């Protein structure tokens, strides 16, 4: 029989409950955590030791796979789509998976050979104000401890919301703003950070981190006591170690490695070529002893870390010869791709990002439906990293977790400076193509995106730039590195990405390779990042300091305004007939969102305003600048188009109406194109205005033939010779006058003629 253990406590005003021994009992470890009505089951499985002990083909890193699965039933919903079943992980699930993975990975022994799987399954999400990652991380940490895997936990996740002096923990706010920060921490240090802010200061971030550590404190003893109560926990897993091989590798290549790193080679390619030759020679030297290449490389990399640490901590010199705070050379090219709405090429050292901005309409927004609810995203940022960026060959696959995570981080940074929909009603898509990579490509994406936005003419308030900070520590001494390269990321102890404006931080992400970092070290890293960020911003502002005054000709024209809720149905029409008709006639895209905002997009300004006029007509909106037409009254107009079935006439308020061929004269019109030409002035009466805004006109103004849409109180009067009498045009005097010039009404007439100019 399995023994069921459970325990509860109050944390930040909500009940925290943990249970094990009831479900998933064949796994290495399992824990079910409920926090504030949100329930997550975490299950840990481990590759069998017999298989792991023989595995020497890949020792490049911890073989850990973490998945966060959000089931629709947890939200009380049935999945959308034809099959009504959950498929591949959504973007939201991928991001949650990365959060848990990044928090636990540095606490598992890196030389563990066994493959480890962690599955966090969201079973219930009754309280939508609780971030699911909080119980997921607690459950995963507890399951790892219960499994017996060499894990230096527990690790606790805390969600901090700071707005001025007000601090809230583990409570999702309805409104955006302030500083929102998710922290994974041990009892003494910070392991992982994910944050976005409205230009927060470095000290505000430090204070929020301190609040997170303070909030998590009572949970550590609670989890530790719970794990101790389970008596079946036994150490499992195979830890790779080979002291004999370690010494052989040191003897074979230590001096050569030191020589390469002491050369301070700035070129990544040259440095890697020399290192590659050392790897090859060492493999050849030790292959006769029966060692696999992965085993030899495992100890070579450990030796490289020692050498780099020594150089940085003792001499303050980095592998490429830079000082600790030095930023790599930066070059910028704007309007890089002709024909696009906006583009920029940002290069920093060996890292290069080509960012392209594209503008679209409301129809182009992405509909999201996940654990955060259904919503529409009007700002998209897609990060693409193909093998050629690092000079490698490989299969081209769909965007992976890394690409999704980097894209979301850059999106957080960019959104902080974007205007609201009322100012800029476009859907915006940014695509970052990483064409070269030597570290910090996500921060290059932030810089390139800001430049591309200004090149497009998007009215962003200011530039935003990003920088990646690194850390080298031996447990006693530590050094913070600015603008880390790929080698420094791999051989170092921290990857701390900070994005912001001149006024403050807007996004940050921190990952550790050691078991946490102190608040004091984070403060030093943030202050050093500020200096680097200001340097990068200066370079960007030198190229373009403010957005272009207007969008490019290739960009679509969009108008957004709100209409009354009661007239939405008039604009849409029966079965969408009205709105489709306006769209078809004007070649404009028209949408109305759930908040009654009308979005009109067209290729030209003329088509845009024509569509707006038609929408206003359909809604019955009154505008002092756009006079309203009245059925039964006379207006001066000009023919803008002659077609087989009639004349299209533009009226004084710029709206167009149709004079059907049967409404031109009581006599038969044999050749309409011979008798009427574009630009010819005519007098028309409003016969009817349809619900879709279409205007029916008549030139038979001497007859009492007003349409059913209204009636005329005017007596049946003649207004001079009819324009078509005896086959001749008798309106030569009228045609010679300007479009806005008309003589007074004919004698005895009580019908008014409207002038709007």
UniProtKB/Swiss-Prot annotation:
Enzyme Commission code(s) on record: 2.7.7.8
Catalysed reactions, semicolon-separated: RNA(n+1) + phosphate = RNA(n) + a ribonucleoside 5'-diphosphate
Keyword check for Nucleotidyltransferase: yes
Domain KH: 556-615
Record's subcellular location: Cytoplasm
Residue ranges that the Swiss-Prot or TrEMBL entry lists as coiled coil: none
Composition skew (Basic residues), residue ranges: 715-725
InterPro entries referenced in this protein's UniProt entry, alphabetically: ExoRNase_PH_dom1 (IPR001247), ExoRNase_PH_dom2 (IPR015847), ExoRNase_PH_dom2_sf (IPR036345), KH_dom (IPR004087), KH_dom_type_1 (IPR004088), KH_dom_type_1_sf (IPR036612), NA-bd_OB-fold (IPR012340), PNPase (IPR012162)
GO CC aspect terms: cytosol
Keyword list, A-Z: Cytoplasm, Magnesium, Metal-binding, Nucleotidyltransferase, RNA-binding, Transferase
TM annotation in the entry: none
Stored SMART domains: KH, S1
Function: Involved in mRNA degradation. Catalyzes the phosphorolysis of single-stranded polyribonucleotides processively in the 3'- to 5'-direction.
Protein name, per record: Polyribonucleotide nucleotidyltransferase
Source organism: Neorickettsia sennetsu (strain ATCC VR-367 / Miyayama) (Ehrlichia sennetsu)
Gene: pnp
């Amino acid at each position: 029989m399995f023994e069921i253990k459970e325990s509860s406590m109050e944390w930040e005003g909500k009940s925290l409950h943990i249970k094990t021994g009831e479900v998933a009992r064949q796994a290495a470890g399992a824990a079910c955590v409920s926090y504030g009505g949100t329930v997550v089951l975490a299950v840990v499985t481990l590759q069998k030791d017999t298989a792991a002990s023989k595995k020497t083909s890949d020792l490049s890193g911890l073989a850990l796979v973490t998945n966060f699965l959000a089931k629709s039933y947890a939200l009380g919903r049935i999945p959308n789509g034809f099959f009504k079943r959950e498929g591949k992980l959504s973007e939201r699930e991928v991001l949650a998976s990365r959060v848990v993975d990044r928090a636990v990975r540095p606490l598992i022994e890196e030389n563990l050979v066994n493959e480890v799987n962690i599955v966090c399954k969201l079973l219930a999400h009754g309280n939508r104000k609780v971030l699911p990652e909080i119980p997921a991380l607690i459950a995963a940490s507890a399951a790892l401890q219960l499994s017996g895997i060499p894990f230096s936990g527990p690790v606790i996740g805390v969600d901090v919301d700071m707005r001025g002096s007000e601090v809230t923990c583990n409570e999702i706010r309805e409104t955006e703003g302030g500083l929102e920060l998710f922290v994974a921490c041990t009892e003494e240090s910070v392991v992982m950070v994910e944050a976005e802010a409205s230009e927060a200061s470095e000290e505000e971030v430090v204070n929020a981190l301190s609040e997170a550590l303070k909030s998590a404190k009572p949970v550590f003893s609670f989890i530790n006591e719970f794990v101790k109560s389970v008596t079946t926990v036994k150490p499992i897993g195979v830890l790779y170690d080979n002291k004999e091989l370690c010494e052989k590798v040191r003897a074979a290549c230590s001096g050569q490695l030191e020589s390469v790193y002491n050369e301070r080679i700035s070129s990544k390619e040259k440095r890697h070529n020399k290192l590659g030759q050392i790897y090859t020679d060492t493999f050849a030297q030790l292959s006769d002893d029966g060692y696999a290449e992965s085993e030899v490389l495992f100890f070579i990399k450990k030796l490289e870390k020692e050498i780099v640490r020594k150089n940085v901590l003792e001499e303050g010199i980095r592998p490429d010869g830079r000082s600790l705070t030095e930023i790599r050379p930066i070059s910028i090219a704007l309007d890089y791709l002709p024909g696009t709405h906006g583009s920029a090429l940002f290069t920093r050292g060996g890292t290069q990002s080509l960012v392209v901005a594209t503008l679209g309409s409301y129809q182009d927004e992405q509909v999201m439906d996940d654990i955060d609810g259904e919503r529409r995203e009007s700002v998209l940022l897609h990060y693409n990293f193909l093998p050629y960026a690092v000079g490698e060959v490989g299969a081209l696959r769909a965007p992976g977790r890394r690409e999704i995570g980097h894209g979301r981080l850059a999106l957080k940074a960019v959104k902080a400076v974007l205007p609201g929909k009322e100012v800029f009603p476009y859907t915006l898509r940014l695509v970052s193509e990483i064409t070269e990579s030597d570290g910090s490509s996500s921060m290059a994406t932030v810089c390139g995106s800001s430049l591309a936005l200004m090149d497009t003419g998007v009215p962003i308030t200011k530039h935003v730039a990003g920088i990646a900070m690194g850390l080298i520590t031996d447990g006693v001494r530590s050094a913070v590195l600015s603008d880390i390269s790929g080698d420094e990321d791999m051989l170092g102890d921290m990857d701390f990405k900070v994005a912001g404006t001149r006024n403050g931080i807007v996004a940050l992400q921190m990952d550790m390779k050691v078991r946490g970092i102190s608040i004091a070290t984070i403060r030093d890293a943030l202050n050093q990042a500020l200096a680097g960020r200001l340097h990068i911003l200066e370079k960007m502002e030198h190229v373009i300091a403010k957005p272009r005054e207007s969008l490019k000709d290739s960009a679509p024209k969009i108008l957004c305004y709100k209409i009354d809720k009661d007239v939405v149905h008039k604009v849409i029409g029966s079965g969408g007939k009205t709105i489709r008709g306006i769209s078809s006639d004007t070649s404009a895209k028209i949408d109305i969102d759930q908040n009654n905002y009308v979005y009109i997009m067209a290729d030209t300004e003329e088509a845009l305003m024509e569509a707006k006029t038609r929408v206003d007509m359909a809604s019955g909106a009154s505008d002092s600048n756009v006079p309203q037409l009245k059925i039964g009254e006379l207006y001066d107009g000009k023919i803008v188009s002659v077609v087989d079935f009639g004349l299209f006439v533009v009226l004084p308020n710029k709206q167009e109406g149709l004079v059907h061929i049967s409404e031109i004269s009581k006599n038969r019109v044999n050749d309409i194109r011979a008798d009427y030409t574009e630009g010819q002035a005519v007098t028309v009466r409003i016969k009817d205005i349809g619900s879709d805004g279409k205007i029916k006109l008549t030139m038979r103004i001497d007859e009492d033939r007003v349409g059913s849409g209204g009636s005329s109180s005017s007596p049946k009067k003649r207004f001079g010779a009819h324009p078509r009498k005896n086959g001749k045009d008798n309106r030569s005097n009228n045609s010679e006058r300007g479009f806005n010039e008309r003589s007074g009404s004919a004698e005895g007439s009580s019908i008014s003629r409207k002038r709007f100019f």
